[in-house]
Amino acid sequence: SESNTCG
């Protein structure tokens, strides 16, 4: 799976 965050 792929997970990313921004902020």
Swiss-Prot record:
Highest taxon of the lineage: Eukaryota
General function of this protein: Presents moderate hemolytic activity at physiological concentrations (micromolar range). Does not induce mast cell degranulation, lactate dehydrogenase (LDH) release from mast cells and antimicrobial effects. In vivo, injection into mice induces increase in nociceptive sensibility, but causes very reduced or no edema formation. It also causes no alteration in rearing (standing on hind limbs), but does not impact locomotion.
Q: Which GO terms describe its cellular component?
A: extracellular region
Any one biological process term the GO annotation gives:
killing of cells of another organism
What are the subcellular locations of this protein? Secreted
- Let me know which tissues express this protein, per UniProt: Expressed by the venom gland.
| Keywords, ordered alphabetically | Cytolysis, Secreted
Protein name according to UniProt: Cryptide Pep-10
